[in-house]
């Protein structure tokens, strides 16, 4: 399990099965198989125990109404918070992908594991189910049925939920409920959640000290025109070798268009990046005139369209924890 050899085998004798009856046996078999999940990852992926948001992880569900729509999220409280070990706590908002859920992304990404080890709060928001009728030609394709999806196109679909308003209400509520360190609020997401992360980065970057979009680059489907409000954004983009689009930085593609945009936005040197490899990770770093890295891109070898706890640890330790954003909007690299 997670590269550690393990197995669990249940054996039922015919006589026992006869005594218990078919219904009980089916119930036990379902309980056995649903206690495990195979999550995406490098190579053959990873088997993990199922972790239920409330029953297993003790997360707290919060519900609010935004523009007449009932919305919710889960909050994970680390032991450091429960024991009152700090006056203020960093916050990570972790956003699920298309047709997924807050509960599903908690299991896949494992951000609560990082939070427990590093002492910060995690919020897993849930998208509102809708069909996406494509009032915007650059939006995601419509769905046959209402499906959880973030209205994250640029510009957003007119007939979809106002996601910026939702995240503003979410952050207001979380800051009212918990002692949040407002200089250390970060956001990450996968796939459609990566699109949402980039939408927040474009339209409402001021509260966030770090961004980590994984599994989708906005230049793949949408025009990457640099924002002009002067706010520095510091994203760490990640794409897998077998992701939705290519992970290559050769030629004109969604990756290069997105990276050129952020370099223009932040005043970074696109043509002379720093590159290095570490195992399956191929890193490209973009720096400003002072030599500070404010954007990075990572291509992951032998990776599908996924997000893993290992990546969550990397993002926090090697990126989020390095940055704070002052109340006046100034972004500071602590490293």
Spans of features found by a protein language model:
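Active-site nucleophile loop of the alpha/beta-hydrolase fold
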Residues: 127, 212-219, 240-243
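The conserved beta1-alpha1 loop
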Residues: 93-97, 215, 239
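Histidine-bearing beta->alpha loop at or near hydrolase active sites
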Residues: 279-280, 301-306
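A domain-start/cap signature at the N-terminus of enzymes
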Residues: 4-91, 103-109, 117, 159, ...
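Catalytic His-Asp charge-relay segment
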Residues: 232-239, 295-298
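Active-site-adjacent alpha-helix of alpha/beta-hydrolase-fold enzymes
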Residues: 239-294
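Flexible "cap/lid" loop of the alpha/beta hydrolase fold
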Residues: 217-233
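Serine-hydrolase catalytic machinery in alpha/beta-hydrolase-like enzymes
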Residues: 9-10, 14, 64-74, 87-186, ...
């Amino acid at each position: 399990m997670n590269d550690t050899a393990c197995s669990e085998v249940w054996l039922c004798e015919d006589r026992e099965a006869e005594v218990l009856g078919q219904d009980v046996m089916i119930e036990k078999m379902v309980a056995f198989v649903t206690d495990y999940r195979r999550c995406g990852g490098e190579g053959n992926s990873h088997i993990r125990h199922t972790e239920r948001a409330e029953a297993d992880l003790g997360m707290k569900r919060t519900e609010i109404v935004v523009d007449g729509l009932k919305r919710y999220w889960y909050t994970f409280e680390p032991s450091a918070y429960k024991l009152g070990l700090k006056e203020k706590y960093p916050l990570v908002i972790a956003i699920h992908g298309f047709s997924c859920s807050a509960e599903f992304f908690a299991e896949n990404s494992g951000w609560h594991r990082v939070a427990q080890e590093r002492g910060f709060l995690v919020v897993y928001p849930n998208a509102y189910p809708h069909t996406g009728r494509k009032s915007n030609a650059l939006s995601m394709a419509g769905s046959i049925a209402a499906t959880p999806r973030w209205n994250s196109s640029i510009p957003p679909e007119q007939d979809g939920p106002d996601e910026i308003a939702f995240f503003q209400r979410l952050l207001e509520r979380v800051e009212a409920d918990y002692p949040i360190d407002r200089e250390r609020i970060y956001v990450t997401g996968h796939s459609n959640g990566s699109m949402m992360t980039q939408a927040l980065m474009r339209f409402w970057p001021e509260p966030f000290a770090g961004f980590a979009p994984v599994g989708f680059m906005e230049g793949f489907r949408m025009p990457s025109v640099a924002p002009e409000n002067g706010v520095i954004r510091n994203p760490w983009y990640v794409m897998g070798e077998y992701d939705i689009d290519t992970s290559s930085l050769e030629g004109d593609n969604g990756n290069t268009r997105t990276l050129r945009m952020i370099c223009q936005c932040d005043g970074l040197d696109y043509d002379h990046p720093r590159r290095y490899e570490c195992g399956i990770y191929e890193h490209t770093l973009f720096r400003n005139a002072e030599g500070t890295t404010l954007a990075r891109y990572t291509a992951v070898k032998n990776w599908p369209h996924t997000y893993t706890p290992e990546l969550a640890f990397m993002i926090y330790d090697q990126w989020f924890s390095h940055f704070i954003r002052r109340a006046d909007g100034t972004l500071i690299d602590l490293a």
